Amino acid sequence: MNEIQKYISENESKMLEDLFSLIRIPSISAKPEHHDDMLACAERWAQLLFEAGADEALVMPSKGNPIVFGQKIVDPAAKTVLVYAHYDVMPAEPLELWKSNPFEPEICDGHIWARGADDDKGQSFIQVKAFEYLVKHGMLKNNVKFIFEGEEEIGSPSLEAFCEEHKELLKADIILVSDTSMLGADLPSLTTGLRGLAYWEIEVTGPNRDLHSGHFGGAVANPINVLCGMIAKVVDADGRITVPGFYDDVEEVPQAERDMITHIPFDEEKYKAAISVKELSGEKGYSTLERNSCRPSFDVCGIWGGYTGEGSKTVLPSKATAKVSCRLVPHQDHHKISQMFADYILSIAPDTVQVKVIPMHGGQGYVCPISLPAYQAAEKGFEKAFGKKPLAVRRGGSIPIISTFEQVLGIKTVLMGFGLESNAIHSPNENFPLDIFRKGIEAVVEFHLRY
């Protein structure tokens, strides 16, 4: 057992209790009724940053939820690492699928089970505990700043303006983020790219009230049927998105990268088994790993209308609504795609209904050069903690603010995430393995020593 491992072992009970104090706060940014919880979580984070060794930890106002800023400057001439994280979490529904209370963390089978255990309270806590270790042992050679927001899960609508206003405060050499996943517990990997995102709500309105389906069915357009028909046209039989101009700015995956992807250890049968599906689906001509990381995609995130209560009610509904999204790749502009999609849906809408397409949040994709000294330091950190060199992989998720950091602050980001697909982020029974939590702290400590 090395010194870092010994420190973690001796202090783990206190570490976990502090983490649990954050998790118990239901900081759900998507629900206005949790407004007070957002402030409570921000204040708790500021307190924990002070306790970890920050010289300054502030809860700062933004146009939306408060932002936590902390820092420790050891030498104005030294490099500065800006650690970004988010303290907001996804809603926990459907609650009936949870095996435990999502906001009362439990340890079972070597995992922490709770909403935010991974995304992003657990992962951001790794960063803070690594910082704490370095401060307490007099080993911190970099200046470290922290910026924790409370709106990542709703698209970070306030953070860009905050960054514009506080450019000098946020000045740094590199941004470090733990909010991504690895290929597996025994397959450490560093994320070198993220997809972008565009998100919409589609509202279809037909008659002025719900109608009797016997009296009107077959004569009046059903908004749910119409909505489903329009959505079905967005992706063709080859898995390609049919919106005109959608692929104009899509850069083909370089052959060298495609070759590298084929060498990534990936068991498609295990992948299917983990999510309980018999077969996979996607764009023709691309592998699963290419489809879910390097290529755009379209998904219906939610759809509703009509009667959904117990029993039956034979109605022809007045309204139907869907929330849909596209994952985008670097060079696709989410504003441009958002308008293209809205124009397309309106162009295929029949005159039998009224259709509204409401753009919601979005963000650009991001690629991290593996030649960055900070990337190489992160690579060494993983190698020290996991005993093997991490693979460099693109991931399919989106963190819209990452590209904004580069545009506004002029700083590149290293994505040093420790999540696993089996951690069920955004789903019931989110969890985080304690073994990965410990290794994560060790890896981040090594990053700071190497950078």
Task: Report each predicted region and the residues it spans.
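Acidic, glycine-rich active-site loops and adjacent beta-strand->loop/helix elements
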Residues: 63, 87-89, 111, 147-156, ...
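Acidic/histidine-rich catalytic neighborhood of metal-dependent amide-processing enzymes
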Residues: 118-193
